[in-house]
Amino acid sequence: MHIPRKTTAIIGSGGKSTLLRALAEELATGGAANAEFIAAETATDKPRVGTSPNKDCPTEKSAGDKPSVDGGELSTRRPAAKENAIVEEPRRAHVIVATSTKMFVPDWCPVLLDPTMDEVRLALSTHPIVCVGRIHRPTGKLDAPRMAFSELEAAADYLLVEADGAKMLPLKAHAEHEPMIPECAKRTVCVVGIDGVGSPISQACHRAERFAQLADASTADAVTPEMVARVLEAESLHDMVLINKVESDNDRRVAERIAALCTTPVVAGSLWRKEFRCLR
């Protein structure tokens, strides 16, 4: 998953906040996400790394110094340096995380509440990641920052914005006012929780009636891979899909079926296990 510099919006359901943290930490340390989330494939997965035709899913050959697959796990090892050679460490990037709607207050990075831009820049001089926003007093959640996202974007290498809500459910459809994608966003990643497939729409989906309408189904119907793809394609709010919680052979088959019906790049895997591969 190529993450361009400046603003990326994260929408959907089933792992947005987890992806926000994973990307922020990788980007800040100059790790895998600094250019790509590389697919971690098992020894039996096909196609192997090095054969992906998708420019957003770089091959092992094209990834250069990026992580490669070693024994089925994500590897960030570099070739052994020559004796006495100076190894240049990757530059630490500055990352701002925020929301355009509301999200739980992060406990894994400094949180700046209603700061000035000078305070944001000062915090970034000592911390690679900062979160910017305001407290929404009725809920205690973090609300959108007062300043424009274009101002925040100018202060950091990366701005990651959680631009959606899903009531902690694995799937969702969007109301007319959703998602709240910043105008400056260069990429929009839609997260899908595969654990919603097989459950009734009424139980697995935020805005179940809207999901059922787009899927040409009833809210009592069980979610199918075809329904998930149909809703994604009907809404067309993203330029990349991340299918999360793919942790079994059956999960992989379901994810592959969804990907086959999508027209945008699709990455599938597990944020918890830190294992992903590009499906299209």
How does the language model describe each region?
Residues 2-27:
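Walker A (P-loop) phosphate-binding motif
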Residues 26-32, 40, 88-131:
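N-terminal phosphate/diphosphate-binding loop that engages ATP/GTP or pyrophosphate donors
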Residues 28-93, 126:
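Intrinsically disordered, low-complexity terminal tails and inter-domain linkers enriched
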Residues 118-151, 202:
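P-loop/Walker-type NTP enzyme "switch/lid" segment
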Residues 136-173:
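Phosphate-binding/switch loop-helix module in NTP-utilizing enzymes
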Residues 177-196:
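Inter-motif core of Ras-like GTPase G domains
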Residues 193-194, 218, 240-251, 269-274:
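G-domain G4 guanine-recognition motif of GTPases
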Residues 261-277:
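Canonical P-loop GTPase G-domain recognition
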